[in-house]
């Protein structure tokens, strides 16, 4: 794997590359992501022909809030590559559907969960949440309870939306276990 990692670093001219746990990690940019994916797929020494997944991560405290990770697998060499792409909130990464057909659903999931829009995607719409859903549930600032309750109304015979109604206020719980009482008391006396 060391040879493959060095070869990839030499050819892609990535600023940073790391490896561990049988996975090579490359940091790409918006301008180079398509070229890097094409190289990794088509180069005879790489042959990362399978896009396993594209997933997002939300880092609200970072200047570049989002990170996209493209998970590639070379079945021939039994090696994985993760290509990480850091994005500002308003960045639109290019769709890679023309490079990997499987990217279509992965990009739709990232859009649905994080609100990241992919330029030139052939069918960018929600895939996991309802079409009327407000917001993107994997964002760290999305409320835990959501904005609306969705339920099936038997009488109306349709799905209805209601504002969230939580009859009980949020409470903080004491994390000490009552079963630790005697042990905790004995330890504090020492």
Curated annotation (Swiss-Prot):
HAMAP family according to UniProt: NDH1_NuoC (MF_01357)
Family: Belongs to the complex I 30 kDa subunit family.
One of the record's GO cellular component terms: plasma membrane
Encoding gene (name): nuoC
Signal sequence annotation: none
Name of the top EC class for this enzyme: translocase
Keywords, comma-separated and alphabetical: Cell membrane, Membrane, NAD, Quinone, Translocase, Transport, Ubiquinone
InterPro entries assigned to the protein according to its UniProt record, in alphabetical order: NADH_DH_suC, NADH_quin_OxRdtase_su_C/D-like, NADH_UbQ_OxRdtase_30kDa_su, NADH_UbQ_OxRdtase_CS
Catalysis: reaction(s): a quinone + NADH + 5 H(+)(in) = a quinol + NAD(+) + 4 H(+)(out)
Keyword Transport: yes
UniProt membrane topology term: Peripheral membrane protein
Quaternary organization: NDH-1 is composed of 14 different subunits. Subunits NuoB, C, D, E, F, and G constitute the peripheral sector of the complex.
Function: NDH-1 shuttles electrons from NADH, via FMN and iron-sulfur (Fe-S) centers, to quinones in the respiratory chain. The immediate electron acceptor for the enzyme in this species is believed to be ubiquinone. Couples the redox reaction to proton translocation (for every two electrons transferred, four hydrogen ions are translocated across the cytoplasmic membrane), and thus conserves the redox energy in a proton gradient.
Keyword Zinc: no
Organism the protein comes from: Wolbachia sp. subsp. Brugia malayi (strain TRS)
Cell compartment(s), UniProt: Cell membrane
Record EC number: 7.1.1.-
GO molecular function: NADH dehydrogenase (ubiquinone) activity; NADH:ubiquinone reductase (non-electrogenic) activity; quinone binding
PANTHER family in the cross-refs: NADH DEHYDROGENASE [UBIQUINONE] IRON-SULFUR PROTEIN 3, MITOCHONDRIAL (PTHR10884:SF14), NADH DEHYDROGENASE UBIQUINONE IRON-SULFUR PROTEIN 3 (PTHR10884)
Protein name: NADH-quinone oxidoreductase subunit C
Coiled coil: none
Pfam family name, one: Complex1_30kDa
